[in-house]
A protein has these predicted regions:
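Aromatic- and Gly/Pro-enriched helix-to-coil junctions and flexible linker segments
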Residues: 27-201, 207-210, 218, 284-290, ...
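Hydrophobic/aromatic packing residues within the alpha-helices of TPR/SEL1-like helical repeat arrays
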Residues: 475-477, 509, 543, 577, ...
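Beta-strand-centric surfaces of beta-sandwich/beta-rich domains
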Residues: 88, 122-127, 156-157, 161-210, ...
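Terminal, low-structured helical/coil segments at or just beyond the last alpha-helical repeat
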Residues: 634, 642, 646, 650-685
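Conserved alpha-helical positions within TPR/SEL1-like repeat arrays
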Residues: 487-497, 521-532, 555-566, 589-599, ...
Length: 685
């Protein structure tokens, strides 16, 4: 994803499902574990009732059980009555008969540690809720098989009772996908994204923010749901993508300001985070739920539900995310040991709370390390047998302290040969970096908390600069290796623009147009760039052409409106903004730009309406608050005008105009005149 201005939370904050308060379910490790030190074989008989049932019930039955009759059942379109287990487990393990029938298979997968699914190596890091059998447990299972799988005396043990309903109590907010997605029987694996509007209860405050302590994910069809992630979309760009896609949801997670905040996988217990580490959810934001679904041979409907547990108390410790990643992945067909690396030097002392590695089907091994300033090295994570089906975020039992100057590094290896049984392409083909499951990725997200509160900004600024440089280098590589691809040059130009390299950006956009003269995106970007460089007429020419080529794109209409205004044609500018608002009512920039032109023309009521709409979508637009304050002041709504002036100043403490507006409203000067400046900085797409 392209994420420019801020240090971000981890994808899925995947580990936000793990926290200081641990609710133990059958798929969790439980409160206490034995070490993996060798254990002698028991001299007495090993029986199911006494020895094996406790292991299976604690470590396996959480997934190897039917969906509860009182839970929302999986909806089988084919009408079959087969037992459907949680997470698509192939059989249940709740009785002696179950265990005896599958005893040989159980012995094999536990001995190889393929089950329970847990990827990190035991010697590197202790994590919350580890799903790992001890050596003694594995030995007991093997001995039970050798002894002929005896049941034992006495009554059969009772299986665990799993919580019904919401495990964390009644949520403050319950959200369900607006429509079901039907997974066809012939679909191998599907990633699909769904917009979920968040109707936060209003507190009456200017910044109507809630703080999320937990998300509890209820899979209505865990048989086919492999995993899910939840992201916050503050700009509502997901709604645009959803409207453009004819089916339920849309295919690719959007780029930009979308921030992943939660991840779910089968068997993961929901956990209520402490109030001081909750994450902010602004009014007006949407959630985007990404579902990874795997067909089980029949058409099935999927429509999960989310429960949000909210707080009104701002957190005292806000986790940030350091992302190590290689976007230069280009694996030749047949290559069995392709390696990528990345590293970052910490500019401040941090505590590492969790680590989340991510790759697709070709990855084999992963390693994350920290080299401290004194020269010592600590392994943060080591995975020797990667399996994308069981990806997760791993939360340390005790946060790992890393001092300023520590170099954190990642190293991933990939196998794109016939020998990799997980390779989805037969015969193997070259594979590059990309978001699709048939592409490859290589990233590690470290969730960290700055030891000193003031260092959070230091981390954010430093990491943004570093990531922009890395993204630019990746875009340069793609443009060189795929020089006939206009989109690659356009993407590189955007990176150059973000870094202030305007000459280079203009060259790349001209290259893109040389390859694709009718590329609307490139014309729009070039027009915006030329306008910013003072070449107004040339800029408008490119923007007009972009609008003709792509007449229903609200982003291009906003840029053309800005171009019209820059050359003094306010009537045409207003017309373009109105078109953009009609095309996409959730385009905050269109509402804002329209308002700042309508106000000085005396259309204060309409300007106020558009400013309110812009702030409903993006409540942290300081210029929108300032302009709304002016409009409300002109209408005599002084109290609300003061509130918005203060909001503008809190968002932009250096704003002289916001300070002057507040002073005027507080009576130190006369109220602003109608032409005082109901025009803020226009916003481009």
């Amino acid at each position: 994803m392209i994420r420019l201005p801020t240090l971000r939370r981890p994808p899925g904050r995947w580990g936000r499902a793990l926290g200081a308060v641990v609710l133990v379910t059958a798929c969790d490790r439980g409160p206490a574990r034995e070490t993996d030190a060798p254990h002698p074989v028991a001299s007495s008989a090993v029986t199911f009732n006494e020895d094996i049932a406790p292991i299976l019930f604690a470590e396996c039955a959480g997934c190897h059980r039917p969906i509860s009759a009182s839970a929302t059942p999986a909806r089988r379109i084919d009408g079959s009555n087969d037992v459907i287990c949680i997470a698509g487990a192939p059989f249940q393990l709740l009785t002696y008969a179950d265990a005896r029938e599958h005893a040989v298979r159980i012995a094999a997968v536990t001995k190889s540690r393929a089950m329970p699914p847990w990827l990190p190596e035991s010697a590197h890091g202790e994590f919350v809720n580890e799903r790992r059998l001890t050596d003694r447990q594995i030995t007991l299972i093997q001995q039970w098989i050798d002894q002929g799988t005896p049941e034992g005396d006495g009554p059969p043990p009772r299986p665990p009772v799993w919580p019904e309903g919401w495990q964390l109590g009644t949520p403050d907010l319950v959200l369900t996908l607006s429509e079901s997605y039907t997974l066809r029987s012939d679909e191998r694996d599907v990633f699909r994204n769904f917009v979920v509007p968040v109707p936060l209860p209003s507190s009456g405050a200017i910044f109507d923010t809630r703080y999320v302590r937990a998300i509890e994910f209820r899979a209505d069809n865990p048989r086919v749901l492999h995993h899910a992630s939840v992201a916050v979309d503050p700009t509502r760009v997901g709604r645009v993508l959803d409207r453009r896609d004819p089916g339920p949801g849309f295919a690719t997670m959007p780029e930009g300001d979308v921030q992943n905040v939660y991840g779910w996988s089968p068997g993961k217990a929901p956990v209520l985070d402490p109030p001081d580490t909750a994450w902010a959810l602004e009014a007006g934001s949407d959630l985007i739920v990404q579902l990874h679904m795997v067909s089980r041979g029949s058409s099935e409907a999927v429509r999960p539900t989310l429960g949000l547990f909210l707080s009104t108390t701002p957190p005292t410790s806000v986790p940030l995310t350091i992302k190590l990643e290689s976007k230069s992945i280009d694996i030749p067909a047949g290559e069995s040991n392709y390696v990528v690396r990345d590293s970052y030097v910490l500019p401040a002392d941090v505590d590492v709370v969790s680590v989340y590695p991510h790759a697709h089907y070709l990855a084999t091994t992963m390693r994350g390390t920290a080299r401290l300033p004194d020269g010592t090295t600590r392994t943060l994570l080591s995975i020797h047998r990667w399996d994308v089906r069981w990806q997760d975020q791993y939360r340390y039992k005790t946060p790992v302290f890393l001092p300023k100057g520590t170099t954190v590094s990642m190293e991933f290896a990939y196998d794109n040969s016939y020998g990799n049984r997980n390779n989805p392409r037969r015969p193997p083909l070259p594979v590059r970096w990309g978001p699709k499951s048939t592409d490859e990725m290589g990233a590690v997200w470290l969730e960290v908390i700055a030891r000193h509160r003031e260092d959070s900004d230091v981390l954010t600024r430093d990491f943004f600069s570093r990531e922009l440089l890395a993204d630019t280098e990746a875009a340069e590589l793609r443009a060189r290796s795929d020089s006939a691809n206009a989109a690659a040059h356009n993407a590189l130009a955007l990176k150059y623009m973000a870094g202030g390299r305007f000459d280079d950006a203009e060259k790349e956009l001209n290259r893109a147009l040389g390859l694709q003269p009718m590329d609307a995106e490139a014309h729009s970007n070039l027009g915006t760039l030329l306008q910013a460089r003072g070449r107004l007429t040339d800029g408008v020419m490119h923007l007009e052409l972009a609008a003709r080529l792509k007449p229903n794109d609200d982003r291009i209409r906003v840029n053309l409106g800005n171009g019209r205004h820059a050359v003094g044609d306010q009537v045409a500018a207003i017309s373009e903004y109105r078109r953009a608002v009609k095309m996409n009512p959730d385009n905050a920039d269109a509402h804002f730009n329209l308002a700042v032109l309508l106000g000085p023309q005396g259309h204060v009521d309409e300007a106020i309406a558009h400013l309110r709409r812009a702030l409903e979508i993006n409540p942290r637009n300081a210029e929108a608050h300032r302009n709304l304050s002016i409009g409300l002041g002109l209408q005599g709504q002084v109290s609300e005008a003061i509130a918005h002036a203060r909001a503008a100043l809190s968002l932009d403490p250096q704003s002289v105009s916001a300070r002057q507006q507040l002073d005027q409203l507080l009576g130190q000067q006369r109220p602003a005149a109608p032409n005082a400046d109901l025009i803020g900085r226009r916003r481009n797409h």
